[in-house]
């Protein structure tokens, strides 16, 4: 075997400060990620975190509001003839427990 070459391998042990691994050689991204603090972008990380928290909070509120059952308000009509409460929502009538003098 004359003239055989070994393909270059990527050393995954040499990772960036974030722990991300990539087979691509992107020096701009590598410099941006490693120099995040020196670029004055620390405030961007905090702002992005708060934006994500607000979005997640809104999603949870909207899901909970949609999942709530509708408020049940029975329609009750007093019938003067037989002292029973007649319900217009289809449920059984119940006896009037209040005694009037």
Curated annotation (Swiss-Prot):
PTMs per UniProt: N-glycosylated and probably also O-glycosylated.
Residue pairs linked by disulfide bridges in the UniProt entry: none
Subcellular location(s) per record: Host nucleus membrane
Keywords, in A-Z order: Early protein, Glycoprotein, Host membrane, Host nucleus, Membrane, Transmembrane, Transmembrane helix
Glycan attachment sites: 14
GO CC, one annotated term: membrane
Membrane-spanning segments: 41-62
Membrane topology per record: Single-pass membrane protein
Family note: Belongs to the adenoviridae E3A-1 family.
UniProt-recorded name of the protein: Early E3A 11.6 kDa glycoprotein
Organism, scientific name: Human adenovirus C serotype 6
Lineage: Viruses, Varidnaviria, Bamfordvirae, Preplasmiviricota, Tectiliviricetes
